[in-house]
């Protein structure tokens, strides 16, 4: 029995087969168990001798079962490890990856250009008050300049708009029509000198076509300090042109009216590659009435006036126009169309 059992144990192919062999020989109804139950019928001397033989067989079977179980477990583990082994030299699985939107790419490029010139990038709320969007920028109620912007007016029910220092702002609410309100907000909360740019989304209630959208992006610039002059503004726009279009680019200013600057100008940049002038935006020296409105607001908050005797310049330009030029996009509506084939072209562009 021993030799037969040891051979069967050694040839067991898996743990289930080994478990069956253990039950066959050592279980409650196993062969060895039955042999031991029959010891009581034997004479004393023969019982003692036979008992020793059966105990030796039991010990040998238990040792063989334990050794075979350990060997089978190690083999199973080795097989599992081999099956789950990862070849790190193989190429990785191809995963879908997104990319930055062309507007984001253009906006980041503009911000980095001005950061290199010492400007700080700040952001403001898209839901704005009539005061910051119009009144403080020298565009009072019934001023004809308000006709330049068709505005999305809001009811404001249940909405609390905060001012530059966390105070509640009263009055009619709207979706900002330009990024210029952040000029006033920043000046209320800070004192000169400073240089900032304000990238952001703006809203106009107008008909859309290939060059006009109801939602688009602007980049606002504001520099305030003692002795700031029009020459500094020209220098800033010149540096922008050089960074965007190379050393052969030039800048042209033409007088134009904006209520919040005086004098005001429309600036264009010479595009050497295209061989033409590109109108990029408007600019000018900050109107004294804007500084007065800022100081008046500061005084209402208990702050001392900070904008007497200083000057500053401001400028604004459209991000979509530059992105259309940079990436050869013929229609502004492509930016918000949500077409994956269009957006996937910009994957990997930094």
Curated annotation (Swiss-Prot):
Residues that, per the record, bind Mg(2+): 262
Keyword annotations of the record: Aminoacyl-tRNA synthetase, ATP-binding, Cytoplasm, Ligase, Magnesium, Metal-binding, Nucleotide-binding, Protein biosynthesis
Entry annotated with the keyword Aminoacyl-tRNA synthetase: yes
Disulfide bond annotation, renumbered to this chain: none
Protein biosynthesis in keyword set: yes
CC cofactor note: Binds 2 magnesium ions per tetramer.
Domain of life: Bacteria
Subcellular compartments: Cytoplasm
GO biological process terms, semicolon-separated: phenylalanyl-tRNA aminoacylation
InterPro entries: aa-tRNA-synth_II (IPR006195), aa-tRNA-synth_II/BPL/LPL (IPR045864), Phe-tRNA-synth_IIc_asu (IPR004529), Phe-tRNA_ligase_II_N (IPR004188), Phe_tRNA_ligase_alpha1_bac (IPR022911), Phenylalanyl-tRNA_Synthase (IPR002319), tRNA-bd_arm (IPR010978)
Cellular component per GO, a single term: cytoplasm
Main location (coarse class): cytoplasm
Names of required cofactors: Mg(2+)
Catalytic activity reported: tRNA(Phe) + L-phenylalanine + ATP = L-phenylalanyl-tRNA(Phe) + AMP + diphosphate + H(+)
Molecular functions per Gene Ontology: ATP binding; magnesium ion binding; phenylalanine-tRNA ligase activity; tRNA binding
EC number(s) given by UniProt: 6.1.1.20
CDD domains hit by this protein: PheRS_alpha_core
Protein name per UniProt: Phenylalanine--tRNA ligase alpha subunit
């Amino acid at each position: 029995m021993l030799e037969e059992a040891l051979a069967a144990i050694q040839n067991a192919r898996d743990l289930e087969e080994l478990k069956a062999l253990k039950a066959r020989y050592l279980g409650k109804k196993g062969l060895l168990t039955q042999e031991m139950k029959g010891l009581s019928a034997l004479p004393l001397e023969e019982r003692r001798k036979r008992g020793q033989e059966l105990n030796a067989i039991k010990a040998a079977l238990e040792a063989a079962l334990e050794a075979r179980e350990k060997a089978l477990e190690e083999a199973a583990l080795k097989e599992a490890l081999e099956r789950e082994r990862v070849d790190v030299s193989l190429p990785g699985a191809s995963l879908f990856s997104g990319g930055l939107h062309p507007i984001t790419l253009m906006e980041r490029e503009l911000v980095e250009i001005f950061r290199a010139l010492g400007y700080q990038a700040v952001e403001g709320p898209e839901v704005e008050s009539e005061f910051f969007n119009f009144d403080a920028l020298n565009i009072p109620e019934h001023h004809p300049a308000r006709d330049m912007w068709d505005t999305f007016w809001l009811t404001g029910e249940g909405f609390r708009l905060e001012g530059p220092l966390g105070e509640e702002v009263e009055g009619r609410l709207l979706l900002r029509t330009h990024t210029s309100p952040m000029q006033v907000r920043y000046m209320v909360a800070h004192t000169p000198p400073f240089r900032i740019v304000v990238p952001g989304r703006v809203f106009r209630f107008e008909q859309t076509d290939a060059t006009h959208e109801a939602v688009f992006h602007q980049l606002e610039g504001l520099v305030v300090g003692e002795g700031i002059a029009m020459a500094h503004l020209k220098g800033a726009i010149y540096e922008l042109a050089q960074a965007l279009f190379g050393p052969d680019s030039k800048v042209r200013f033409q007088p134009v009216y904006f209520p919040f600057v005086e004098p005001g100008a429309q600036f264009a940049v010479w595009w050497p590659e295209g061989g033409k002038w590109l109108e990029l935006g408007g600019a000018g020296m900050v109107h004294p009435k804007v500084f007065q409105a800022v100081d008046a607001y500061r005084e209402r908050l208990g702050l001392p006036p900070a904008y007497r005797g200083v000057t500053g310049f401001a400028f604004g330009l459209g991000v979509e126009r530059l992105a259309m030029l940079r990436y050869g996009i013929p229609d502004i509506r492509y930016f918000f169309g949500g077409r994956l084939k269009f957006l996937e072209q910009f994957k990997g562009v930094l």
